[in-house]
Amino acid sequence: MAKDIKFSADARAAMVRGVDMLADTVKVTLGPKGRNVVLEKAFGSPLITNDGVTIAKEIELEDHFENMGAKLVSEVASKTNDIAGDGTTTATVLTQAIVHEGLKNVTAGANPIGIRRGIETATATAVEALKAIAQPVSGKEAIAQVAAVSSRSEKVGEYISEAMERVGNDGVITIEESRGMETELEVVEGMQFDRGYLSQYMVTDNEKMVADLENPFILITDKKVSNIQDILPLLEEVLKTNRPLLIIADDVDGEALPTLVLNKIRGTFNVVAVKAPGFGDRRKAMLEDIAILTGGTVITEDLGLELKDATMTALGQAAKITVDKDSTVIVEGSGSSEAIANRIALIKSQLETTTSDFDREKLQERLAKLAGGVAVIKVGAPTETALKEMKLRIEDALNATRAAVEEGIVAGGGTALITVIEKVAALELEGDDATGRNIVLRALEEPVRQIALNAGYEGSVVIDKLKNSPAGTGFNAATGEWVDMIKTGIIDPVKVTRSALQNAASVASLILTTEAVVANKPEPATPAPAMPAGMDPGMMGGF
């Protein structure tokens, strides 16, 4: 395929046009009085959102050179979202500011490499200064404040703080669509996995269609149970204890399933069979998690174990197990605290080394199931469009809250970025390095300027007053008042703020040091084939 190539000023100018188109679309959403953006969808109703990364991912420009600029800013938003889960709009605003200020100086003859060096030095100083002024987040009320600021809803803040209190900071908090109009919180204590009973005849409560097992034994295997003779000796031993049994296996079929069901119906003993969760290697890991949680052993060929040789010592135990048609919940497994702690440490070490987003998500789920439980925030809204918008806001709020707990908080509304200006300005740099520092100094003001602008105030006036205000005092754009930001609950997680700045500086520096851009040449449209001579157009069906 033929290529189009642009050089130096032309290349940078084309990319900056793309940067501006994306950034100008995203930045209208910043702050408490930010507006919404409507996104057309190929199917269904349009999506109305103020989530920066969602908007950025939707933007595709016709001009290839402009589109490359837009995609680089979209990458800033995505990367910030991956690391901190929020702050994507701030990252976009900072990127645009650094690119614009930098381009002025490069056009005037400054060396882009020197500018890049200055930007990197200034950014590192700003990040260290942010960490130095961060305050730790502890307590339900502080967590609720962080979530409320991100979601613009005190109610959502309460749900998230309640969920984190119930399942712990490492706990799984999932966000689902509710069937009703109200948003509600549901907490499932213990380990839950998405496999239900293999036969409805195994239920103990016909009204709720669930099987409740009190103080059960648990048989855990990655094998298929087809022949009842394989587990008959074990069943006879369990029968003597007069306690129920849960079988977790690759599958239970053949003669084994009807035999178990028949004994259950006759009241011989209470047994429930479910399929093992997950697939492949992930299934083995999850079965091992269940075994450690319940104090049992996975009966697997990997360990040289056979079902027919299994004894009571291989069975796990729990205080209670509830099984419905879709899921199984194990409460208060009998595994040793030390073994569970070691397993949690192993999963955390795997989390640190994995590079796959999918693997990271699954490891976090496993960690949470071992560490405490699962909280589900069920989002309700009057319409599907409102539901999608609310769900995105709650996801952002949850991510921001986790980030706040991890690294602490700083004054929100862009105030913290203004606070660190003094430290960055004190850097003793010369030449183009000093120019790079000055570019960052100007960019640090931009989030406050945009928040004020979106709220109908003059940004420059707000910034001047902010620079001369006591530490911690900032501008509440929602009310137009000057307040103590942290006491008022206007806060940002330091992880969100620093990630936004670091990612913006990194990509903006790359754009400024770009000297050539190569794009695919658009292919000319292929003309439609000519109609054979003598063919009646009516034969084409009238199209």
UniProtKB/Swiss-Prot annotation:
Its EC number is 5.6.1.7. Belongs to the chaperonin (HSP60) family. NCBIfam families: GroEL, PRK00013.1, PRK12849.1, PRK12850.1, PRK12851.1. Forms a cylinder of 14 subunits composed of two heptameric rings stacked back-to-back. Interacts with the co-chaperonin GroES. It is found in: Cytoplasm. ATP binds at T29, L30, G31, P32, D86, G87, T88, T89, T90, G413, N476, A477, A478, D492. It catalyses: ATP + H2O + a folded polypeptide = ADP + phosphate + an unfolded polypeptide. Its main location: cytoplasm. The keyword Chaperone applies. This is Chaperonin GroEL. It comes from Streptococcus pyogenes serotype M1. GO terms for molecular function: ATP binding; ATP-dependent protein folding chaperone; isomerase activity; unfolded protein binding. GO terms for biological process: protein refolding. Keywords: ATP-binding, Chaperone, Cytoplasm, Isomerase, Nucleotide-binding, Stress response. Together with its co-chaperonin GroES, plays an essential role in assisting protein folding. The GroEL-GroES system forms a nano-cage that allows encapsulation of the non-native substrate proteins and provides a physical environment optimized to promote and accelerate protein folding. The keyword Membrane does not apply.
